């Protein structure tokens, strides 16, 4: 179901625990979306990346070729207070920050810039 690299190994997800992008075989995209929606009901939204790209979730400009080539085709977007991990090691890959870049909560969608003289 997951696309493979040239060595036959599954492609690892892109993004973070707050915006998780999978590389799914096109012919199995709907199947994967349905399976994940059922499994993650109440925890995360599962959305084809095309909907996010077409909806301007990555900005007003057209997404770059590099982004489209690397991002994957199925997004898992955890709800407030949730996260998704494909690999976890205690004390190494723990998420301690709320509002990590990438989520869809208002706090994560807003960027705050502070300029100060150094």
What positions do the PLM features span?
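Feature captures the catalytic ectodomains and active-site-proximal regions of enzymes
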Residues: 1-118
């Amino acid at each position: 179901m997951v696309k493979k690299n040239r060595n036959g190994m599954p492609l690892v997800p892109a993004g973070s625990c707050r915006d998780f992008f999978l590389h799914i075989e096109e012919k199995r995209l709907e199947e994967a979306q349905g399976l994940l929606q059922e499994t993650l009901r109440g925890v995360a939204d599962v959305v084809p990346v095309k909907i996010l790209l077409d909806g301007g979730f990555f900005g007003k400009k057209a997404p770059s070729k590099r982004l489209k080539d690397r991002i994957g085709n199925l997004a898992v977007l955890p709800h407030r207070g949730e996260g998704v991990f494909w690999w976890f090691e205690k004390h190494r890959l723990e998420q301690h920050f709320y509002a990590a870049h990438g989520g869809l909560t208002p706090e994560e969608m807003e960027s705050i810039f502070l300029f100060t003289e150094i």
